Every structure is written in structure tokens, then in C-alpha cells.
Amino acid sequence: MPMYQVKSYHGGSAPLRVELPTCMYRLPNVHSKTTSPATDAGHVQETSEPSLQALESRQDDILKRLYELKAAVDGLSKMIHTPDADLDVTNILQADEPVPLTTNALDLNLVLGKDYGALKDIVINANPASPPISLLVLHRLLCERYRVLSTVHTHSSVKNVPENLLKCFGEQARKQSRHEYQLGFTLIWKNVPKTQMKFSVQTMCPIEGEGNIARFLFSLFGQKHSAVNLTLIDSWVDIAMFQLKEGSSKERAAVFRSMNSALGKSPWLVGNELTVADVVLWSVLQQTGDGSGVAPANVQRWLKSCENLVPFSTALQLLK
């Protein structure tokens, strides 16, 4: 006999029926237009709305394009970082041969703009204590290409200018009227910390530094180079102005080794044609005096090749 007797809660002799759940959590059907909860496991509709299908299609297209872009980037990365890459720099160098300096003159209007009859005048301020030899070489090269009106002036900030610098452009006798010249080249000896150049006094700020001015002047020759050669030329100009001219003895020795290696492969520093890199490096070597008896064999041969050209030999006379 039980200690406690409890009445049945399911009602008499009726069988006990318990409805067991078919899922742990019952949620409303998100695809249904009604808010009533789903009553069975097959609440997901087999067909979705057109807008949802369009969204899924766009997502697939975007993912496909991203995968293609990633594959292209991976291929470029492998090409750059792998030593045996498919990109052959030698073919690029051979495909883009530089235009020699003996070709026809460049249309200055394309580089300097139209002045509607006015003479295009390049004005350079330079300190006679440190004459920019490379600019004098480039001036002579420009005279071989264009009809250049050359003038030399002395600023009041300078007391004494050597006679050879006053006559660095030769005799100043004008043989033609001003409008018959293609280019004006005015050199002003002035007490300035760095060599300065202005082409359009009203519209441009001055270009400072012998290397930067040499780059600008050499662009007037219209020489074409590949991207690789242009990078090498700019690198040599920077090396000349910062390491060779202002660096320590160890830095200058490293420059000589690099020059000797490059000149062992070609007659000039970059390829088979004279570039602004040769002009600037030769000028710095003359200013520092490092080219006399210290340079390696290939550099000595290159120095003689430079001095065999009239623009270089004429500028060299100014240092004596």
C-alpha cells in the first residue's frame, strides 16, 4: 500500500500521449510571408524570390573576378621575385634602343610650350666659386642642335669673376636678330648656395641643383630610353651628386667600382650612347679631382672618351 496516493493528471484510464519535438528549437519560416512558426522540418521553400537569386548570381560573379585577380597578382609576384622569371630584361633593353644625339632637333614647343614669337630663354644662376661644368658641356651640346643665343652676366653679389668664366660661352657677338634664335641660354654668376635655373620667370619655381638642371637640359635633346635605362640614368646622376661629390672616401671607392663594372660592359655608363649620367659624373670627377690617376682602367678609358668630344674638352679648359 503506497504511503501517498496521488490522483492521475491525464484523466482516468485514457492512454498517455506525449507529443515529442522533432527539432531542438522551433523558429519561424523566414521564406514565408506569414509570421506563423513552421510546423515541420520542411519549412524551407524550394524556390526563392527572383531578387535573392539575382543577389546570389552577383555574389558568384564578384567572387569569380576576385579569384581571377588574385591569380594574376600571384603570377606577377612570382615573375618579380623569382630569379628565372619569364620577364627578360635583356629583351627590353634591346627593343628600346636610345636615339643618338645626332638626330634631328626636337620641337621645343612640345617641351617648353608656345611663347607666340617670344624667345624661349633659360636663365641659370651659378656661383663662380663652384662652376657647374656639366651645364657648360650641355650648353655646347645644345649649340650643336639648336640656334642658341648665349649670354653671360655678373650679379652685384659677386665681386670678382675669373676671366675664363666670363668668356665661358666664347665671344658674345650677336650675328642674328633675337627672333631668329630657337633658344636663349643666359648664365648669371651670382652668390647662390646652389645652382638655380628658371625657364619661365612668371609661372615656375626655380629648379635647384646641378644634377636636376642637367636632367632638364638633356631632355631637350629628345633622346628616348626604356624604363630600365631611365632608372639607371637617374640613379647614376644621384650617385654623382650625393656619393661621389659629397660622400666619404669609402663611398667614392664604391662608386668607382660600380662605374668600372658598368663601363666594362658598354662604352658609356648606360648603353652605347652618351647620356646625362656621363656628363654629370664626368663633371663631378673634374670638380673633385678624383679622376686623375685614381680611377680604375675602364673609368680612365671612359674619361678619355669624354675628353675627346669637343664639348667636354672646351669645358675642361675653364678649369685650367
Swiss-Prot record:
InterPro entries: AIMP2, AIMP2_LysRS-bd, AIMP2_thioredoxin, Glutathione-S-Trfase_C_sf, GST_C. One of its GO terms (molecular function) is molecular adaptor activity. Disulfide bonds: none annotated. Phosphorylated on serine residues in response to UV irradiation. Ubiquitinated by PRKN, leading to its degradation by the proteasome. Residues 220-317 form the GST C-terminal domain. One of its GO terms (biological process) is negative regulation of cell population proliferation. Keywords: Apoptosis, Cytoplasm, Developmental protein, Differentiation, Nucleus, Phosphoprotein, Protein biosynthesis, Ubl conjugation. Residues 82-162 are annotated as: Interaction with PRKN. Residues 31-52 are annotated as: Disordered. The modification Phosphoserine is found at residue 36. Residues 162-225 are annotated as: Interaction with TP53. It is found in: Cytoplasm, Cytosol; Nucleus. The keyword Phosphoprotein applies. GO terms for cellular component: aminoacyl-tRNA synthetase multienzyme complex; cytosol; nucleus. The keyword Cytoplasm applies. Required for assembly and stability of the aminoacyl-tRNA synthase complex. Mediates ubiquitination and degradation of FUBP1, a transcriptional activator of MYC, leading to MYC down-regulation which is required for aveolar type II cell differentiation. Blocks MDM2-mediated ubiquitination and degradation of p53/TP53. Functions as a proapoptotic factor. Part of the multisynthetase complex (MSC), a multisubunit complex that groups tRNA ligases for Arg (RARS1), Asp (DARS1), Gln (QARS1), Ile (IARS1), Leu (LARS1), Lys (KARS1), Met (MARS1) the bifunctional ligase for Glu and Pro (EPRS1) and the auxiliary subunits AIMP1/p43, AIMP2/p38 and EEF1E1/p18. Interacts (via N-terminus) with KARS1. Interacts with EPRS1. Forms a linear complex that contains MARS1, EEF1E1, EPRS1 and AIMP2 that is at the core of the multisubunit complex. Binds FUBP1 (via C-terminus). This is Aminoacyl tRNA synthase complex-interacting multifunctional protein 2. It comes from Cricetulus griseus (Chinese hamster). The gene is AIMP2.
